[in-house]
């Protein structure tokens, strides 16, 4: 082992010299990483043989075993997208209906990776990725290699901030030139390069690639009152803040700002993909609140996507887990937004009819949201044949007759025994955001289904090693890993299970909101529609969908089978008490409190199930008024809102 450690040390040091001194990498990142991992493992087992010049002992580079999960104290939400002036005007109308005097701050939407930075007494403690908004990955060591992120703030604050890590166009060009010379695959775009860099296990590679950041939000409570004040404070603390933003109450001025930025987009040193418009007042932001997925006080205008022409060669029709049959066009390959595109969604049959899309047509292809390739329209001037699109009447999977409901745009297979529907449901159940059964992907699900081993999600927990070993291509080691992943999934918190059941309108975030109140899957079997609709962030559509699902006898049977198999039914997060005195009420504190300070009062209200906001509106249910209460109290009286005092609150 001593000899192997010496060999690895010498070899890796030579590679490091080629990479950092000569700027001419002589080995791929993946090969370097494998050798580095081997050295770390050997050094941990035989510490007496660690050499002084080992790359693991060098300042400026640390090899990481992997990235630990990190639960965000303050969740990261996605933003609602807008693609037109009309959508921005609709957003403005919604906001101004609540706050006629609202102003907006328009900021650039950096095309990078969302990061969260937590400081304690001014010192950086954790840097994390966004992940699913609730759980990301701890990448602190890599974050520390980004030069413009301060390790110590100019003030000893305990604070969590948010921003975007990105790679400049200059750095991206240099990296791809080096990768090309070394025979490595080039990165498709700066965003992909930044993502790959932040997940490097060798931190010295992160330092070499020169990522940068722009910070834009204080996620933890702040003394600032306006978003533009937050940006100023972040800059004062030592963070990089993007210099391009505009404060205005006029959507016309915001549109002018968008067009100005769009015109100079190519002159910037970094990629942007739009402009984010935020309500500037933090109190108004708090009052407007959130939907399940996004804040109501912000919207992201996305620049028009790059468009290319391609020919439709054929169309595939596939059945999803809810029975919806989706058409996908097979295209002549085109380069689009840094990737080769040969397939694009046609959305649904109504879309095909509306656009008169036919096989053989030349069409305009773009990436919806810069992610999903889609067909925009037909280039009619290039139509040279009249082959009409054949809309299927029978399910491509089971042969059952497809239905087209009046209130829907898609074809649907309503056969509960449809093989594709069952397989998609099983795939969804095993997916990362659901039960996260590692290795149980589409290919293995299909083999299990065709072999007759699984027909619903409960069957997954009855699988044996022998079942897996009978599948083509599955060896003993793989079977053991799959069984271990299935066993591990039993202990997931119940919101994962609820999402995995694939109920219409019940996404991962909605699942968490529901179980924060009900606490257990079994409780949903008797939950009332009106009770569910009261949960903040939900509504009648979600409540109806959930109750309709659990009213079915098959749902009760499935829950019982899963419970018998040992699958956890309990929510492991902090539960909201739906029996609390103020559950579901929106409450505003105003005036001076004599016995409780403001934070104590807020904590008590939240413990009683209330949502505490900063300003009074028609959505407010209750105002707690202390002495010297001013305009908020007067507004509450004018709106006929219930008003109580501090003594009333203390007695609850």
UniProtKB/Swiss-Prot annotation:
Keyword field: DNA damage, DNA repair, DNA replication, Ligase, Magnesium, Manganese, Metal-binding, NAD, Zinc
The enzyme's E.C. designation: 6.5.1.2
Residues in BRCT domain copies: 577-652
CDD domains (UniProt xref): BRCT_DNA_ligase_like (cd17748), LIGANc (cd00114)
Cofactor(s) the protein needs: Mg(2+); Mn(2+)
Keyword Ion transport: no
GO-annotated molecular function: DNA binding; DNA ligase (NAD+) activity; metal ion binding
Keyword Lipoprotein in annotation: no
UniProt-annotated binding residues for NAD(+): 29-33, 78-79, 107, 130, 164, 278, 302
Protein's job: DNA ligase that catalyzes the formation of phosphodiester linkages between 5'-phosphoryl and 3'-hydroxyl groups in double-stranded DNA using NAD as a coenzyme and as the energy source for the reaction. It is essential for DNA replication and repair of damaged DNA.
Protein name per UniProt: DNA ligase
Protein species of origin: Streptococcus pyogenes serotype M12 (strain MGAS2096)
């Amino acid at each position: 082992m001593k000899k192997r450690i010496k060999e690895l040390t010498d070899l890796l040091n030579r590679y490091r010299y080629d990479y950092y001194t000569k700027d001419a990498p002589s080995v791929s990142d993946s090969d370097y990483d494998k050798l580095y991992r081997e050295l770390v493992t050997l050094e941990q087992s035989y510490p007496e043989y660690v050499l002084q010049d080992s790359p693991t002992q060098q300042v400026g580079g640390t090899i990481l075993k992997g990235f630990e999960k990190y639960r965000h104290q303050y969740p990261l939400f996605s933003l609602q997208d807008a693609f037109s002036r009309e959508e921005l005007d609709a957003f403005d109308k919604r906001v101004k209906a609540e706050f006629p005097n609202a102003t907006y701050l328009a900021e650039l939407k950096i095309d990078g990776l969302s990061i969260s930075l937590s400081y304690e007494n001014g010192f950086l403690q954790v840097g994390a990725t966004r992940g699913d908004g609730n759980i990301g990955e701890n990448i602190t060591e890599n974050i520390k290699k980004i030069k413009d992120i301060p390790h110590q703030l100019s003030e000893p604050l305990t604070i969590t901030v948010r921003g975007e890590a990105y790679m400049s166009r200059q750095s991206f060009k240099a990296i791809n030139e080096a990768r090309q010379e070394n025979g490595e695959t080039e990165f498709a775009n700066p965003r992909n390069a930044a993502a790959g860099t932040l997940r490097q296990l060798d931190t010295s590679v992160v330092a070499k690639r020169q990522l940068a950041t722009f910070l834009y939000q204080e996620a933890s409570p702040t003394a600032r009152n306006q978003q533009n004040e937050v940006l100023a404070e972040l800059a004062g603390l030592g963070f990089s803040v993007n210099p391009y933003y505009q404060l205005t109450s006029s959507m016309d001025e915001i549109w002018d700002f968008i067009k100005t930025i769009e015109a100079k987009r190519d002159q910037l040193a970094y990629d942007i993909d739009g402009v984010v418009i935020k309500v500037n007042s933090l109190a108004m932001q708090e009052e407007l609140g959130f939907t399940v997925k996004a804040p109501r006080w912000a919207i992201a205008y996305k620049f028009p996507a790059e468009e290319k022409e391609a020919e439709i060669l054929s169309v595939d029709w596939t059945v999803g887990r809810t029975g919806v049959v989706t058409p996908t066009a097979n295209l002549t390959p085109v380069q689009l937004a840094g990737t080769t595109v040969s397939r694009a969604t046609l959305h649904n049959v109504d879309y095909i009819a509306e656009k008169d899309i036919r096989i053989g047509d030349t069409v305009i292809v773009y990436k919806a949201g810069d992610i999903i390739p889609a067909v925009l329209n037909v280039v009619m001037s290039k139509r040279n044949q009249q082959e009409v699109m054949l809309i299927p009447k029978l399910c491509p999977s089971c042969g059952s007759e497809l239905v087209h409901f009046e209130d829907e745009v898609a074809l649907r297979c309503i056969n509960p025994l449809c093989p594709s529907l069952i397989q998609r449901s099983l795939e969804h159940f095993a997916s990362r955001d659901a039960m996260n059964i590692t290795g149980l992907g589409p290919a293995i699900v299909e083999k299990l289904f065709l072999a007759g081993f699984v027909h619903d999600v409960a069957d997954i927990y009855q699988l044996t090693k022998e079942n897996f070993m009978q599948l083509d291509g599955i060896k003993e080691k793989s079977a053991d890993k799959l069984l271990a992943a299935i066993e591990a999934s039993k202990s997931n918190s119940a919101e994962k299970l609820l999402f995995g059941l694939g109920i219409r309108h019940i996404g991962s975030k909605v699942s968490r909101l529901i179980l924060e109140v009900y606490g257990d899957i079994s409780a949903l079997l008797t939950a009332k529609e009106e009770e569910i609709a009261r949960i903040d962030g939900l509504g009648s559509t979600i409540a109806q969908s959930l109750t309709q699902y659990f009213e079915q006898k098959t749902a009760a049977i499935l829950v019982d089978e899963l419970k018998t198999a040992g699958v956890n039914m309990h929510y492991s997060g902090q539960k909201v008490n739906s029996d609390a005195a103020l559950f579901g009420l929106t409450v505003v504190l105003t005036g001076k409190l004599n016995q409780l300070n403001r934070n104590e009062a807020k904590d008590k209200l939240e413990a009683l199930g209330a949502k505490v906001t900063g300003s009074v509106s028609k959505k407010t249910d209750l105002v707690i008024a202390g002495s010297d209460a001013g305009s908020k109290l007067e507004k509450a009286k004018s709106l006929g809102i219930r008003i109580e005092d501090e003594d009333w609150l203390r007695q609850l």
